[in-house]
Amino acid sequence: MKIIYYSNPYFADCDFPLIKELREQGHQIIYILLFTKDSLKSTLIDINTPYPQNGIFKPDIYKELNIYKDFIGYNDTYIINNVIPQKSIFEKIKFAHKVIKFINSFKADYIWTTRPFQKEEWPLYFFNKVALTIHDPFPHSGENLSKEKSLNKKIALNFSKKIFILNERLKNDFCVKFKVSPLKVYTNKLGRYDCIKLFHNDQITINKKPYILFYGRISPYKGIEYLIESFLKINKLHPELNLIIAGSGKLYFDFSPYKNIKSIELRNYYINMDETAILFNNAEFIVCPYTDATQSGVIMTAFTLNKTVVASNVGAINETVIDHQTGLLVKPQNIEDLSNNISLLYTNKKLRSTIEENIKNIYSKGENSWENITKQYIDSLKK
C-alpha cells in the first residue's frame, strides 16, 4: 500500500518502529513529521535550536535526528517545520494550503494520522481516505481538551474512514461515548519501543545504590504521591533501596516533605534519550502507580529492555501487564497493595527473572511483535 503517515514528535517512540516495519514489509510509506515550537523536546526528539524557517524539508535540517537515519531511513521522510507562529489567519491558511497540496500530490491510498487535523487542514478529510490512531480515547484525570481540540476531535471521528485504538477493553465505551460506529473502529496494540536501544552514555551520573524508577511526564493521574508513601514504608525494611522520579511537568502535590529524604531523588525536567536509557537499564524495575490510564508507553519502554513493572490495574493496563506473567498489578491508590508488591518484586529475584524472560519471549515474536502488529494494521486498512 501507499500510505502517508502524518504524525508528530509526541508519538515518535512508537511511530519509528512502526514506520520501520511497514517499510520492511514492502509498503510505500511517506512519513511526515509535524514540528511545532512545543514539540521540539518530546519522547525521542531533543532539539535545542529550531530551524528558523517554516516549510516542508527533509529531516537533515535537524542534526539531532541523524541517530535515527539508519533506523527509519530518510527516503520519503519529511519534516513540516511550523515552529514560527503565523501572525494572521491568512498566513495560517496559506501554510495549511501548502501542506495540503504537498500531501495530496502523493495520491496515497490512505492518510494515516495520529492527530486530529486543525481546522485549516480539514480539506484533507474530503479528498482522501483518512485513518486515525487515537492513543488516549478519554482525557486523563486533571486534563481536559480545549473547545478547539474537542471540535477537531469530533470532526476527525466523523470523517475518518478507519479509527484505531490501542486496546480492546475500551472500544465499546469509546464507541458509545463518541457515537462512533463500531464497524469503523479497529483495535491493535503497542509494540516494543526499539529506538531506546540506540542510546547509551556512560558519562551520565546514576545512583549506584539499587533503585526503582518512576518515569514519565508528571501529571495528576500518574499517582506519584501514592508511590512515595508506599516507598517510605518499604524503605524502613530496605534502607539500601532508592526511588528515582524522572520526568518533566508541574508537580501537582506538595513535594517539600520529601525534599531532604536522601533515598528519594526527583529529576523534574525533560529526560533526554541518553539519560532515559541509563535510568531504565540500571533500575531494578519500573513502577507505574497511575490512578487512571489507557495503555502506557512507559511500560513498552520497560518491556523493550526486558524490565518488569509494578502497575496499577486501571484502564487497559491489564492487557499489557499480565499479573505475575509480564509484571505485577496492584489496586489503584492503594498504598498497602503497592508497597507489598514492590517489596515482593524487589526481594524475589527468581520471580523477577521469570517475568523478564516472559517479556522477552512475548514481545520479540508472536502476536505482540511489530511484524504481527503491522500486518493487523494493513489488514484493517484493506477492509
Model-derived regions: residue spans:
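A short, well-ordered alpha-helix in the C-terminal region of glycosyltransferases
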Residues: 240, 337, 344, 351-366, ...
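Acidic donor-binding loop of glycosyltransferase active sites
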Residues: 278-294, 307
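Conserved acidic donor-binding segment of nucleotide-sugar-dependent glycosyltransferases
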Residues: 323-324, 328-335, 342-350
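Membrane-proximal helix-turn-helix segments that form the acceptor-binding/catalytic region
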Residues: 97-104, 146-166
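Donor nucleotide-sugar binding/catalytic pocket of nucleotide-sugar-dependent glycosyltransferases
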Residues: 159-198, 373
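Nucleotide-activated donor-binding/catalytic signature segment of Leloir-type glycosyltransferases, i.e.
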Residues: 254-277
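Conserved donor-binding/catalytic core segment of Leloir-type glycosyltransferases
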Residues: 205-222, 228-231
